[in-house]
Amino acid sequence: MPGEIFVRPYMFAAALAGVLAVSVPAQARDICTLIADAATRTVLHQEGDCETRVTPASTFKVALAVMAYDAGIVISAHEPKLPFKEGYADWIATWRQDTDPSMWMENSVVWYSQRLTEMLGAEKLTAYAQKFGYGNADFSGDPGKNNGLGRSWISSSLKISPLEQAGFVAALVDGKLPTSPVAMAGAMELVQQGGVSEGWALRGKTGSAFPRLADGNFDRARGWGWFVGWAEKDERRLVFVRLTQDEERHAVSGGLRARDALLADWAALMRGLGL
């Protein structure tokens, strides 16, 4: 299965725990840190709960890019350029402009995702996600709201675990997803550079979202933060996942802080793995 990941016991977690804790703010906790070899799918480091599914939030854009390329909707990094219209999601200033695929990924533009999901439709989205092993592949949206194409991946029905995220990314970078090679290469090109550490060049996608309270409102003090992607050095590729959850409200998104924390931890992680 494309999204399959092979787990082996990781023996260094206790030794690294004290080192990694220093870079994580006291107001957030790591749910999972996961590193795996992209070619063999072997987990090299696993710490925390990496099996529970939560919303993918904007990390879903990577899978959506593969789907849209494969379906012929996305043609290149700059096609199609779609016009912004009043009424579209625009709570970030950079979203209020005509947007192409490169801008979509860089600025994490929700309304562009919504136009792509509408063009794909629920049936194709579900079929692709099932073939990718992408979480529960549930695009139904909020119960009774008929909004699956608009927000199923944002604190709604679509859920994925860190292990499943790693499996999807491993299949993507290893060229093993059941899509055209052009679709995989095009999607990878869109993913932004995440930083360089210890000679490793990281590329990944952040994601931020809030869990729901019992009354359906968002719990803005308990936001999730994702950073999901791959790292390259010489001829080797590793896939990584960092998932955090806040314990109080923050001005900076959880995804950006998860990215920065993983970058700060990367050198210690690589030393612990002997890489």
Language model: regions and residue ranges:
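A short, well-structured edge-of-sheet supersecondary motif
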Residues: 26-48, 229-230, 242
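Mid-domain, small-residue-enriched loop/turn segments at the edges of structured enzyme/sensor domains
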Residues: 92-93, 97, 101, 117-173
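Bacterial N-terminal signal peptides that target proteins for export
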Residues: 1-14
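Short, well-structured active-site flanking segments
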Residues: 70-86, 179-184
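Bacterial N-terminal signal peptides
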Residues: 13-21
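Flexible glycine/proline-enriched surface loops and loop-helix/loop-strand junctions
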Residues: 46-51, 97-98, 106-113, 144-154, ...
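Active-site SXXK
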Residues: 53-80, 104, 165, 240
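Structured C-terminal helix/loop/strand segments within mature extracytoplasmic catalytic/sensor domains
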Residues: 49-53, 119-121, 173-275
